[in-house]
Swiss-Prot record:
Residues 174-215 are annotated as: V2. Residues 20-707 are extracellular. Specific enzymatic cleavages in vivo yield mature proteins. Envelope glycoproteins are synthesized as an inactive precursor that is heavily N-glycosylated and processed likely by host cell furin in the Golgi to yield the mature SU and TM proteins. The cleavage site between SU and TM requires the minimal sequence [KR]-X-[KR]-R. Glycans are attached at residues 36, 69, 118, 135, 148, 158, 173, 204, 216, 258, 261, 272, 282, 288, 300, 312, 322, 379, 420, 431, 495, 498, 652, 668. Residues 544-564 are annotated as: Fusion peptide. The lineage of its organism: Viruses, Riboviria, Pararnavirae, Artverviricota, Revtraviricetes. The keyword Ribonucleoprotein does not apply. Residues 409-451 are annotated as: V4. GO terms for molecular function: structural molecule activity. This is Envelope glycoprotein gp160.
């Protein structure tokens, strides 16, 4: 019992230790994670005309979509979708570059004397026409268009009848005087203006004082050539390192917080560049159903209605007549294009074709189906009316550009046709539909509308006005598909809902690009693991060639973290391969068009997209390098994971979900990684200072020992050489000083016959002491030198003996250490042999036991039928 309790406690302790094991921050490179971005996208187009080739790169026709198993929020309007905002800015630049408005100089901001031009046709209306127009009713039989009897589809119109019902454009011939080539002399000029483009003081029609409209804020800079572009479609593409997400949900209506059918693409579909107010022309998105998009899902001030393509709605606009343009040279370098003198233009007009009433009826049915939190108007579709707005000409009319000319079309007749009633623009009933001149009145129903062409317009993107050259010569015509309309939903006290055409241009790009979302790929992720970085070595991961694209990389966004982490090497290759491939394609296109791109604004944007991609790639690599993780897909660190309450579910959680949970921790994690990297660099620096002693196995390098012995041998030779040099120097010094005999050890006797104490003649006193004094001095000096030489010799001998003994002792110790090492290696070898023998015996015993168990199981299986038979026999007997 006690043993069982101890085993249980031991197992519980082991489990606690395993569960509380320290985790460390691990850096993963190549995780499929992204964040919203507002980076500048670039454009592609299949069009090969001049504008397209100078502003966009050729289309690669790659429409690959990779589905993602994730949910993502989407928003269609420009204030929350940077791609939609970019479209508005870029299309405005298209207008500026191609239509070339004239600005900054005001030669025509002067007083002009104007005379109204007479009509080129009789002002009286023929009787046949009068008879057909005086009693116009709501029935379709009075319309100048043929209608299919079995449906409400408008098939064709009689252009002659339409043109007879339209008035001519009112125009005036204006004369003015200004300095020309000679500055001190004024010259008279004559220019024809449309009456809508001049401001005149009250007076008779024969002679009026007029000024150009918006004279104070719209001026002319240069002679502006008349240019235009045909229908142009382009695609927005994400720079390298970025991507476009697309929402494919069926119920998407411009706003959704959890779009589930998401795919990733490199470029959008082809979108149109037609700018209009009210109606959406030539849209790229159309389905077999009517859709209503509300801004931010709840706004009634900005509503997008997408028509059902089943109704085949189109509009054809024409400017009849063979208009001619007369160039007027105003001054040196400035030519103003005027209409030819004494001519009046016929009005332009637009004819609406298709089942418009059926489409409008379906729109009303969809409006009343809106949830109550999004629509509080009437549920009676008969009380829902389509109307126009009042105010600036661009807002009050259908405004669009047709072959470079700006059309302003008054929609009253067509709106009366759609609403199937005869009222004035204020919804007041009126009797009769006869208007001014030949034209029908505002209460008439028509499937066509009258249009004006103007040269002075309000800029739709900036708060300014632009002046363009007068309309071009010849016949103008363009046909467009109507895919939707921009409206406002207004309610009033009469239990009526007014659907008002809106001039908001951004609705066009919301319809075209609202399903797309520009994101920045952030391939660096953090997660806790139980592996700590080994700081003993620094080896660099080998880089491999890249062969796949980044769409496949993002395709793993919906997989679990564990499955994605096991393929990080391949995913990082996909990411970098996509970056490199996109850069290669973009660079090739830029190089092919470098001469044409160098002066265009969109060309600069394309180059900027390339620079942005390079900056992003270098930024990611710089971050990895700062953490010591350069060129690594999985990089373990020495930073402990301090947030134990935040751990990933590797089998069920995606990287995107995990990154969103720890996004607020990223700042702390990166700071700790940088500090750990700095400390590691300091440790590495100190470690390298001791690198010559760091490797234990370097002691067994024979070449190092030879170097040490060589140094010792050279030291001994140096000492011996110094000793020899000193000896030679001593000998030479003695020779140079001369020979000095040593003092005698035995007294030298004087000459014979002379006693010791004998005195010579004339000598007196004892001379013995004085005669021996020089000998004593000489003897003392020689003795000192002899002693010094002996001591030097002894010191050299002792030094040699000490050096010899030291070397001998060192060799003895080395021999002893080598013997110990040899003994240790022998013991290790013996232990290893014993361990191998023990493992072999253990394996043999285990194999034998396994064989016995298998044999027993085999015999049991084989003997089972016999034992069953024996048991049955015993039971039956």
């Amino acid at each position: 019992m006690k043993l069982t309790l101890l085993i249980g406690i031991l197992l519980i302790g082991i489990g606690v230790v395993l569960n509380t094991r320290q985790q460390w921050v691990t850096v993963f490179y190549g995780v499929p994670v992204w964040k919203n971005s507002s980076v500048q996208a670039f454009c592609m187009t299949p069009t090969t005309r001049l504008w397209a080739t100078t502003n966009s790169i050729p289309d690669d026709h790659d429409y690959t979509e990779v589905p993602l198993n994730i949910t993502e929020p989407f928003e269609a309007w420009a204030d929350r979708n940077p791609l939609v905002a970019q479209a508005g800015s870029n299309i405005h630049l298209l207008f500026e570059q191609t239509l070339k408005p004239c600005v900054k100089l005001s030669p025509l901001c002067i007083k002009m004397s104007c005379v109204e031009l007479n009509s080129s046709e009789p002002t009286t209306t023929p009787k046949s026409t009068t008879a057909s127009t005086t009693n116009i009713t709501a029935s379709t039989t009075t319309l100048p268009c043929v209608q299919n009897k079995t449906s409400t589809v408008l098939e064709s119109c009689n252009e002659t009848i339409i043109e007879k019902e339209l008035n001519e454009e009112p125009a005036s011939n204006c004369t003015f005087a200004m300095a020309g080539y000679v500055r001190d002399q004024k010259k008279k000029y004559s220019v024809v203006w449309n009456d809508a483009e001049i401001m005149c003081k009250k007076g008779n029609n024969s002679n009026r004082e007029c000024y150009m409209i918006h004279c104070n804020d719209s001026v002319i800079k240069e002679a502006c050539d008349k240019t235009y572009w045909d229908e142009l479609r382009l695609r927005y593409c994400a720079p390298a390192g970025f991507a476009l997400l697309k929402c494919n949900d069926y119920d998407y209506a411009g706003f959704k917080t959890n779009c589930s059918n998401v795919s990733v693409v490199h470029c959008t579909n082809l979108i149109n560049t037609t700018v209009t107010t009210g109606l959406l022309l030539n849209g790229s998105y159309s389905e077999n159903r009517t859709q209503i998009w509300q801004k931010h899902r709840v706004s009634n001030d900005s509503v997008l209605v997408l028509f059902n393509k089943h109704y085949n709605l189109t509009v054809t606009c024409k400017r009849p007549g063979n208009k001619t343009v007369l160039p007027v040279t105003i001054m040196a370098g400035l030519v103003f294009h005027s209409q030819r003198y004494n001519t009046r233009l016929r009005q332009a007009w637009c004819h609406f074709q298709g089942n418009w009433r059926g489409a409008w009826k379906e729109v009303k049915n969809e409006i009343v189906k809106l949830p109550k939190d999004r629509y509080q108007g009437t549920n009676d579709t008969e009380e829902i009316y389509l109307q126009r707005l009042f105010g600036d000409p661009e807002a009050a009319n259908l405004w669009f550009n047709c072959q470079g000319e700006f059309f302003y079309c008054k929609m009253d007749w067509f709106l009366n046709y759609l609403n199937n009633r005869t009222v004035d623009p204020d919804h007041n009933p009126c009797n009769g539909t006869k208007g001014k001149g030949k034209a029908p009145g505002p209460c008439a129903q028509r499937t066509y509308v009258a249009c004006h062409i103007r040269s002075v317009i309000n800029d739709w993107y900036t708060l300014s006005r632009k002046t363009y050259a007068p309309p071009r010569e010849g016949h103008l015509q363009c046909t467009s598909t109507v895919t939707g309309m921009s409206v406002e939903l207004n309610y009033n006290s009469k239990n009526r809902t007014n659907v008002t055409l809106s001039p908001q241009i951004e609705t066009i790009w919301a319809a075209e690009l609202g399903r797309y979302k520009l994101v920045e790929i952030t391939p660096i992720g953090f997660a806790p693991t139980e592996v700590r970085r080994y700081t003993g070595g620094h080896d660099r991961t080998k880089r491999v060639p890249f062969v796949l694209g980044f769409l496949g990389f993002l395709g793993a966004a919906g997989t679990a973290m564990g499955a994605a982490a096991t393929a990080l090497t391949v995913q990082s290759q996909h990411l970098l391969a996509g970056i490199l491939q996109q850069q290669k394609n973009l660079l090739a296109a830029v190089e092919a068009q470098q001469q044409m791109l160098k002066l265009t604004i969109w060309g600069v944007k394309n180059l900027n997209a390339r620079v942005t991609a390079l900056e992003k790639y270098l930024e990611d690599q710089a971050r990895l390098n700062a953490w010591g993780c350069a060129w690594k897909q999985v990089c373990h660190t020495t930073v402990p994971w301090q947030w134990n309450n935040r751990t990933p579910d590797w089998n069920n959680m995606t990287w995107l979900e995990w990154e969103r949970q720890i996004s607020y921790l990223e700042g702390n994690i990166t700071t700790q990684l940088e500090e750990a990297r700095a400390q590691e660099e300091k440790n590495l620096d100190a470690y390298q200072k001791l690198s010559s002693w760091s490797d234990f196995w370097s002691w067994f390098d024979f070449s190092k020992w030879l170097n040490i012995l060589k140094i010792g041998f050279l030291d001994v030779l140096g000492i011996i050489g110094l000793r020899l040099l000193y000896t030679v120097y001593s000998c030479i010094a003695r020779v140079r000083q001369g020979y000095s005999p040593l003092s005698p050890q035995i007294h030298i006797h004087p000459w014979k016959g002379q006693p010791d104490n004998a005195e010579g003649p004339g000598e007196g006193g004892d001379k013995r002491k004085n005669s021996s004094e020089p000998w004593q001095k000489e003897s003392g000096t020689a003795e000192w030198k002899s002693n010094w030489c002996k001591r030097l010799t002894n010191w050299c001998s002792i030094s040699s003996i000490w050096l010899y003994n030291s070397c001998l002792t060192l060799l003895v110790h080395l021999r002893s250490a080598f013997q110990y090492i040899q003994y240790g290696l022998g013991e290790l070898k013996a232990a290893a042999q014993e361990a191998v023998v023990a493992l072999a015996r253990l394996a043999q015993n285990a194999g034998y036991q396994i064989w016995l168990a298998c044999r027993s199981a085999y015999r049991a299986i084989i003997n089972s039928p016999r034992r069953v038979r024996q048991g049955l026999e015993g039971i039956l007997n």
